[in-house]
Amino acid sequence: MALRGVNMPLATVASEAIAERVWLKMGLKEEDIRAFFTGPAHLPWHRMGNLNGWDGPLTDGWQKEQIKLQHKILNRMRELGMEPIAPAFAGFVPTAFAERHPEIQFKHLEWGGFDEKYNAYVLPPETPYFKEIGKLFIEEWEKEFGKNTYYL
């Protein structure tokens, strides 16, 4: 990629491991967090907010290996002069978070004809939780992987 002029690649590996840390800090139980993530093959759809829980959960081993892999990826990107674009909080929340906050009007998405239990909830950006979770996500990411300039 670097040889072809790509200098700002996405670096989304291990974003679920970082999100898990954030949700634990927000008071969710591990089993509720694990029920939120899809299996590895479906993570692109999970990250886009299309699908939750399908073919999951992710194991502790998976999360640890993703953290190791992301360190290697980021080191190499930086060696090649690339500026990684890291993930940020996009507003998708576990069902357990939505259930804990009935005072918030979450948007409940539907996608691909999947049963309601697999659909995502979106936290409205005007709520104080959006900023709090977003800040926690970046703090956790930078604590693990170091300072970053660009987030998506």
Annotate the PLM regions.
Residues 2-152:
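Aromatic-lined carbohydrate-binding surfaces of glycoside hydrolases
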